[in-house]
Structures are given as structure tokens and as C-alpha cells.
């Protein structure tokens, strides 16, 4: 297995960086552009394993799509809600957004569509969304455990109507259903039982739908109404830089007491993970925001924090990776759902922090990290891109941190380590 050793710095970082387009926005834009009537162009689109699996699935479904990675541009010809292919065998890799969004998309078709992924993807929950699709007219045939891949969707259009679903494990299922709802045969209302995890991602979905011409009426945090007959309009759409992936560069400034500026990303971003800036501010960082960049300057000493990260749970690993350098303990709460991601992220973080000699307490939905010295070690990444990217930041402060399987970042940020090392050279 390949490894990368992170060079520890004896100085603060001082750099300006550019981050590729958002994975979450790229895949949402691909779906709504495929449903729109006419040609859309996505600028600053992300080219990674996740987005390429998504594009391949659209191509198999008969949506004409042209990828230009050198320009970070994707062109596709939307078919106005039609799914041209009547049969397809679709592979989603380890991409949760592809799995959920494509499953919802094929429910609008009239045919037979099999979906499968890598072994870990077969363990990730799909059931609530599939129950809605079945109630709306589809038939789902599971080859193994009910509610999990692989399965075949037999579809004849989505009826719409009133649905109740749980969203305590992932918000991606609700996002998928929201995006297909304008093409239902009647108005659709989704009511969420209990607390909706990652609400910020639902808000991002609704904002992107509005950018393409469709309104979602939200009542409180738990009810969403979509009028039937609305149609997405083809767009020339620029994807924002990925706020989740920018978090590692901002964390580098925080942990070294340095300065990092990320171009073309601002506090006005529609991505919920821009709230990472608020976390860093509470820990003692200074934030400078302009109309075309955001800049973080780290303090001499990071402060501990007790924080609910339900809405920004993709950043748990980023915070955990810098937590040992704080002046007091860091407690991360309300993130049980991250146990169902690319790996059990709570367990993985706890295991690797302990490998580094850090004292950490694990609970079902939270963890508490004590500050203290770190022992160099090789970090297991569990095929999880965010483990590799986050613990690289730890290595800036401690010599001898080695990241195993750095290629796993290809899922959302193929050239992460190239850009990370370029930041260090500035």
C-alpha cells in the first residue's frame, strides 16, 4: 500500500490556494441539469471518482454528456424529465450521492434499472428513500438485505403525494427525493420524522433547485412542499469551490498559527460547511472575508470547544485532527449518523487518535478529545478520503506522521496532496 509522510513545519503556513469545485454541488447540478430541457454547462465542476461515477450513470441512462476535465467543465443535454434508457446496470462505487440521486432519478423512468456499489456501499442505508419510491409507483427488488444494495428498480414514473420519512442517518435521501419531485404526477409533500441530520445540505439542495427555476416551500425544519409541473431550466452554472475540502487548508492555518487564503470561496457560500469558519473563530482564529476569497489566520494557541456538529458532520475529522493541539478538551456532539459514511467515522477517528497517543472518549453519538503530546504513527484511512485529508494536517505539527493509502482522496479531491504540498512551499 502506498504511503505519504507529511513534512512537519517549523514555521506558520502562509499561502493562497484554489480548491476544486464542490462535490455536493456538482452532483446535484448534474441531476437537475439532466432533468432540465436543453443544454446546460457546469463550470468549475469537480472531476473525481464520485462525479465520474455519476456522469457515467447519466450516460448509461441516455443523457448526452461531455466531460472536459482540463477546463473543469461539463456539458449535458437535459431531456426534460425523460429517462431515454429503458434498461441499465448502474455501478456507483462508494459514492453515496450517486447511489441515492440516481436511484431517485430512475424512478421517473419507464424501465428496469439495477444499482450496485462496492462492498461498503452495500452497507449504507437506502431504505427510507426506496420505500417512498415504492409508494410512489416503483417496484424495488433486493438481491440481499432489504433496504440495501444491490437492487433493481422497476419504474413507471413517480406519482408524488404525501410522504413521511426518517432522516436520522443521512440527508442525501431527502435531497434526492426533493430534486425529482417537480416531475411527479401530483404535488408532493415530504414530512421528516424527528431531527433531520445535516439540514444545511437540504438547504443547499433547495437553493440549487431555485437556481435552476424550481421552488421548494419549506414549513419549519421538517416539511417540504413541491408543486408538480415545475420544470428545471437549463443553465450556465458555476460550481463553488468545495467548502468541505477547503476546511483542511483553513485548519492548516489554524494549527500552525499561519495564514491561508482560499480564492473564490466566501462566507456567502450556499454550502453548509462554510460554517467551519465559525468553528475556527470560536477556537481563536481570525477570519477575513471579501467578495472573492476567505482568509483564516491562526492564533498562537487554539482554544478548546464543545460543539454540536450535526449540520457540518463532514468536518468532524478535520476538527478531531487539530483537537490535540488545543488548550483544553474538544467535545464533538450529535454525530451518530457519521457511523454510516465511507467508514464508521467516529470509530475510525477514535482508533487513529489513540494510535497517536491521544486520550479520547468514544460515545454512540459523540467523542471527547483531550489535548496532549502526539506520538508519530502511520494513519489508517479505511478507504475514507476525509481520514487522509484531515490527518495530513496533524502532520504539520508532528514529525513522522505517515498517511496510508493517500490515493483514497480520489473520491472527492484527486490532487489533494499535490495542492497541500504546494501550500507548504509558498
UniProtKB/Swiss-Prot annotation:
Catalytic activity, as annotated: 3-phosphoshikimate + phosphoenolpyruvate = 5-O-(1-carboxyvinyl)-3-phosphoshikimate + phosphate
Organism annotation: Nostoc punctiforme (strain ATCC 29133 / PCC 73102)
EC code(s) of this entry: 2.5.1.19
Similarity remark: Belongs to the EPSP synthase family.
Assembly and binders: Monomer.
Localization, UniProt: Cytoplasm
Lineage of producing organism: Bacteria, Bacillati, Cyanobacteriota, Cyanophyceae, Nostocales
Annotated active site: 314
Residues binding 3-phosphoshikimate: 23-24, 28, 170-172, 198, 314, 341
Keywords: Amino-acid biosynthesis, Aromatic amino acid biosynthesis, Cytoplasm, Transferase
Gene Ontology process terms (BP): amino acid biosynthetic process; aromatic amino acid family biosynthetic process; chorismate biosynthetic process
Keyword Transferase attributed: yes
Gene Ontology terms for molecular function: 3-phosphoshikimate 1-carboxyvinyltransferase activity
Protein name per its UniProtKB record: 3-phosphoshikimate 1-carboxyvinyltransferase
Pathway: Metabolic intermediate biosynthesis; chorismate biosynthesis; chorismate from D-erythrose 4-phosphate and phosphoenolpyruvate: step 6/7
Binding residues for phosphoenolpyruvate: 23, 96, 124, 172, 345, 386, 411
Gene Ontology cellular-component annotations: cytoplasm
Gene: aroA
UniProt KW Amino-acid biosynthesis keyword: yes
Amino acid at each position: 500500500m502506498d504511503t505519504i509522510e507529511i513534512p512537519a513545519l517549523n514555521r506558520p503556513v502562509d499561502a493562497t490556494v484554489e480548491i476544486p469545485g464542490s462535490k455536493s454541488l456538482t452532483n446535484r447540478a448534474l441531476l437537475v441539469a439532466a432533468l432540465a430541457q436543453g443544454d446546460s454547462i457546469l463550470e468549475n465542476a469537480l472531476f473525481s471518482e464520485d462525479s465520474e461515477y455519476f456522469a457515467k450513470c447519466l450516460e448509461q441512462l441516455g443523457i448526452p454528456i461531455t466531460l472536459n476535465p482540463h477546463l473543469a467543465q461539463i456539458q449535458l443535454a437535459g431531456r426534460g424529465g425523460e429517462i431515454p434508457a429503458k434498461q441499465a446496470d448502474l455501478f456507483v462505487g462508494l459514492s453515496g450521492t450517486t447511489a441515492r440521486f440516481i436511484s431517485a432519478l430512475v424512478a421517473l423512468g419507464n424501465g428496469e434499472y439495477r444499482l450496485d456499489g462496492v462492498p461498503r456501499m452495500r452497507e449504507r442505508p437506502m431504505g427510507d428513500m426506496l420505500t417512498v419510491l415504492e409508494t410512489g409507483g416503483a417496484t424495488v427488488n433486493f438481491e440481499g438485505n432489504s433496504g440495501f444494495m444491490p437492487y433493481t428498480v422497476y419504474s413507471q414514473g413517480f406519482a408524488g403525494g404525501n410522504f413521511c420519512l426518517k432522516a436520522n442517518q443521512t440527508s442525501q435521501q431527502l435531497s434526492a427525493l426533493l430534486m425529482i419531485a417537480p416531475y411527479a404526477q401530483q404535488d408532493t409533500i415530504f414530512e421528516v420524522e424527528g431531527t433531520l441530520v445535516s439540514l444545511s445540505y437540504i438547504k443547499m439542495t433547495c437553493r440549487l433547485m431555485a437556481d435552476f427555476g424550481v421552488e421548494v416551500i419549506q414549513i419549519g425544519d421538517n416539511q417540504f412542499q413541491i408543486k408538480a409541473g415545475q420544470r428545471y431550466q437549463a443553465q450556465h452554472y458555476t460550481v463553488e469551490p468545495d467548502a468541505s475540502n477547503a476546511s483542511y487548508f483553513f485548519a492548516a492555518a489554524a494549527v500552525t498559527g499561519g495564514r491561508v487564503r482560499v480564492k473564490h470561496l466566501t462566507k456567502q457560500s450556499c454550502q453548509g460547511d462554510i460554517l467551519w469558519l465559525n468553528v475556527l473563530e470560536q477556537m481563536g482564529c481570525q477570519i477575513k472575508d471579501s467578495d472573492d476569497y476567505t482568509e483564516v489566520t491562526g492564533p498562537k494557541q487554539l482554544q478548546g470547544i464543545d460543539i454540536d456538529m450535526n449540520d457540518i458532520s463532514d468536518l468532524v475529522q478535520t476538527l478531531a485532527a487539530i483537537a490535540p493541539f488545543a488548550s483544553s478538551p474538544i467535545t464533538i456532539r450529535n454525530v451518530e449518523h457519521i457511523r454510516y459514511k465511507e467508514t464508521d467515522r467516529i470509530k475510525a477517528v477514535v482508533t487513529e487518535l489513540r494510535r497517536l497517543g491521544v486520550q479520547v472518549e468514544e460515545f454512540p453519538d459523540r467523542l471527547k478529545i483531550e489535548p496532549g503530546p502526539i506520538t508519530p504513527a502511520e494513519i489508517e484511512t479505511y478507504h475514507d478520503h476525509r481520514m487522509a485529508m484531515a490527518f495530513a494536517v496533524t502532520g504539520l505539527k508532528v514529525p513522522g506522521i505517515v498517511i496510508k493509502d493517500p490515493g483514497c482522496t480520489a473520491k472527492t479531491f484527486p490532487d489533494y496532496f499535490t495542492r497541500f504540498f504546494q501550500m507548504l512551499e509558498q
